[in-house]
Amino acid sequence: MSENEQAAKAEAPIFHVVKLYLKDLSFESPNAPESFSVESEPKAEFNLDTKATQKDDDHYEVSLEVNVKVASGDGKILFMAEVSYGGLFMVKNVPSEHIPMVLGIDCPNILFPYVRQVISSVVLEGGYKPMVLDPINFAALFHHAQQQKAAQQGEKA
């Protein structure tokens, strides 16, 4: 292998999942067992947030936090579930302008199936039908957040 090939290999971008883990989990069913017999169509509220923290030169922790609140048609809470799922990722030799995209798109895409499974399982264990969360387009969310941030900075100028 030539020196140029070795240098190129040494500088190749690296994206590696070091560890995935459940950080926090909460489930409440404040009106059970009466809530099990609710016949009206439930209404669900869903909130999602991602947080990224640099741990050292090449490692980042990304957390995906999901809150789900489901209420009956008359507004009584059936259940609430909160999940924070984290991942430690190695991001090395990636251009600095691309790191926010890796942390805001790629990492949440890896974490979301685990969050979906935890939510589904805990809701089932709570006595309800499993809740399957729809896929999320993290790229669209990321780009929308970037546009909002740019617009806010434009207003301040």
From Swiss-Prot:
Q: Which GO terms describe its cellular component?
A: cytoplasm
Name where it's found: Cytoplasm
Q: Which InterPro entries match?
A: SecB, SecB-like_sf
The Swiss-Prot or TrEMBL record annotates one GO molecular function as: unfolded protein binding
Chain's gene name:
secB
Q: What is this protein called?
A: Protein-export protein SecB
Q: Name one Pfam family in it.
A: SecB
- Which family does the entry's similarity section mention? Belongs to the SecB family.
Gene Ontology biological-process annotations: protein folding; protein tetramerization; protein transport
Assembly description: Homotetramer, a dimer of dimers. One homotetramer interacts with 1 SecA dimer.
* Keywords associated with the record: Chaperone, Cytoplasm, Protein transport, Translocation, Transport
Residue span of the signal peptide, if any?
none
Q: Does the keyword Protein transport apply?
A: yes
Task: Quote the Gene3D superfamilies the UniProt record gives.
Answer: SecB-like (3.10.420.10)
What does this protein's UniProt record list under function? Answer: One of the proteins required for the normal export of preproteins out of the cell cytoplasm. It is a molecular chaperone that binds to a subset of precursor proteins, maintaining them in a translocation-competent state. It also specifically binds to its receptor SecA.
Keyword Chaperone listed: yes
Which PANTHER family does the record cross-reference, listed alphabetically?
PROTEIN-EXPORT PROTEIN SECB, PTHR36918
